[in-house]
């Protein structure tokens, strides 16, 4: 463990993000909706630009689920979703961890109750599953 930490520090860690910052959203169940963050992400995706959006959603019990959606077209990285469910007290065995999906396709999915609002569906993924959604 110490060798890993020393190695990460010596190498400078992950390179800084270079792209469009689409902001940080805090969305409680159905009570808030970050339209500008979603539009920023969608516009970057359509134009092939790098972008990052950070979202904190919550379980029905109120446990936070931080999620990051990264669009990184350069170098073939594509779309990366990281979702941390480790604070989900009712998540069940094996589901309280960080999930990572590396995907090649993203589409908008209108909400049933309000078609002006949408989430993202990501498909053709590797990592923790073949698809995922971002609220």
Protein language model regions, located:
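A mature extracytoplasmic/lumenal domain signature
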Residues: 56-59, 83-85
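Sec-dependent N-terminal signal peptides
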Residues: 1-3
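Extracytosolic low-complexity repeat regions of secreted or lipid-anchored proteins
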Residues: 65-135
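C-terminal motif of bacterial Sec signal peptides marking the signal peptidase cleavage site
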Residues: 8-10
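Disulfide-rich extracellular modules and peptides
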Residues: 13, 24, 42-43, 105, ...
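Bacterial lipoprotein signal-peptidase II cleavage site
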Residues: 12-19
């Amino acid at each position: 463990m110490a060798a890993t930490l020393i190695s990460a520090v010596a190498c400078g860690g992950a390179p800084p993000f270079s792209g469009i910052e689409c902001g940080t959203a805090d969305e409680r169940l159905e009570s808030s909706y970050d339209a500008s963050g979603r539009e920023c992400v969608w516009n970057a995706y359509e134009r092939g630009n790098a972008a990052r959006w950070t979202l904190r959603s919550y379980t029905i019990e109120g446990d936070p689920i931080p999620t990051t959606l990264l669009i990184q077209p350069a170098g073939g990285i594509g779309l990366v979703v990281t979702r941390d469910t480790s604070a989900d007290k009712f998540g069940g065995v094996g589901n309280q961890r960080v999930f990572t999906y590396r995907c090649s396709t993203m589409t908008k999915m209108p909400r049933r109750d309000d078609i002006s609002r949408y989430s993202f569906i990501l498909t053709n993924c590797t990592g923790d599953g073949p698809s995922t959604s971002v609220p």
